[in-house]
Amino acid sequence: MKTGEPGMATASAGAIAAAADTLGPMTGRRYVESLKDGRDVWIDGERVADVTTHPAFKDMIAELARIYDLQNSAPYRDEMTCLDPASGQRISVSWLLPRSAEDLRRKRRNSELWNELSWGQLGRSPDILAPYIISALHLKDQFSAVKHRHCDFGENLENYYKYCKSRDLFLTHALGDPQVDRSSQPQNEQRTVGEDQEVALHVVEETSDGVIVTGGKQLSTAAPHSQECYVSLSATFARRSNPKCVLAFAIPTGAPGLKILAREPVSRWFGSWGHPLQMLDEQDCMLFFDRVLVPWHRLFMLYDPTPMVRMLGADGAGVNFNFLGWANLCRVETRMRLMTAVATMVAEAIGVIDYREVAAKLGEMATYCEVWRHAMDGVEHQAGPTPTGQWTLGPARDLHIWFTQVSGRMVELLREICASGIIMQPSENDLASREIRPYLDRYMRGKDVDVEYKSRLFRLAHDLAASSFGLRQEIYEYWHGGDPNRNRINLLRSFDQSGMKARIRELLKHPLPHGEAP
């Protein structure tokens, strides 16, 4: 079995700390070249020789490369990159450690741009995992408090942050266990299949170089085109009865022994102008670890989950800092506004914008957009410093719970406004056909718009609300923040009702303060 790691994974801890070859903000060319590392990616029964040229991945990779180049060019450079106060070197704002309200505003604008440029469709853009790693630094001392003779977990975390920041690396993550037998208690994720082979990721042995791990992890979105994979526990699985299943670490996506199984593509029209959003299929993957070596300096947690339980709020105390930052909030805002604008343009294109019931549906969608905007402003207003000096946004857990409900409703409204047009439109090849085009011009145009405009608009709506791509996005929005029911329960446990309960008890003691009881 292969147990080593290439490149940084086998480098010394000092090499990560020094990060001498600081490369600055990622560029498109550097990003694409970094993916040609022999990573073991599988899709539809075949091993992918090169993800940068495979039809299922190349459009997404090209789009990310385009955005990486934009962040290094005017007018985006000054908004998406900055000078790092710690090193004086230019870095991506995604990796900026926020030390003030102004830093948080800069990070908001950076996240807005990442999501505007990708139409709010990337749940795992490069801007997503950077705040996750940054915010773990808030608990650096607690990670360090868990002792191990081979390493300091808090120091490892800080060094890894510096390493990623200097290179502007694109991280994916994997938190959940394989969906094999959910009847097992979530605090005991040691499951068995066949000849007592354990399914959950676990430590097989310790060596002088690190720990060797085996098992499966899901669901790693964007794994085929990421550069690093952060592996940890979700709030659902944070408590374990078997300590060897308790670990958090990061490895290169091309690490030997790591197999990546991508799902079937959701798009039939790779690179098609006719379905513009489907090039943003970021893929979702299973990760299989076959005796993968994780060096000591890349471990952040081992055997003791206490810091991670605290970070995730799985101890019932609630999370006192918003570790997801702006990335998800801005993505949701862009997605909501896109769906509302498309629905409005569809209503205009078929002459129903003034219908009372249609206008009411559009107004409902606009209401959701405005509520979200005000909520984002509230999260920013509640921002403040942590004891470590790092600035954090106000709590946003309740917003993500709300959006799991609203997202499905907005998709439903878009479908209703489009009516049958969302499934019956001519293709680009139909539009190019000289024989059939006259019929399209006559029978498939809209109100004051030609058939090209109308069909392309409706196909955009189809991408959002009726295609395999759109359904995948809807499912992603429901689950990406974890089990919505668990999130609601955790919110209830930390929701302060003491004041109102006390007033109600007083009311029940004296129900008629200005009269007499009968």
Where are these regions (language model features)?
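Short secondary-structure subsegments characteristic of cysteine-rich extracellular domains
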Residues: 382-399
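N-terminal low-complexity or amphipathic/hydrophobic leaders
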Residues: 48-115, 387, 477-480, 491
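Glycine-rich flavin
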Residues: 82-228, 234-249, 254, 259, ...
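Acidic/polar, glycine-rich intrinsically disordered N-terminal extensions of enzymes
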Residues: 2-82
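Extended amphipathic alpha-helical segments enriched in small hydrophobics
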Residues: 324-384
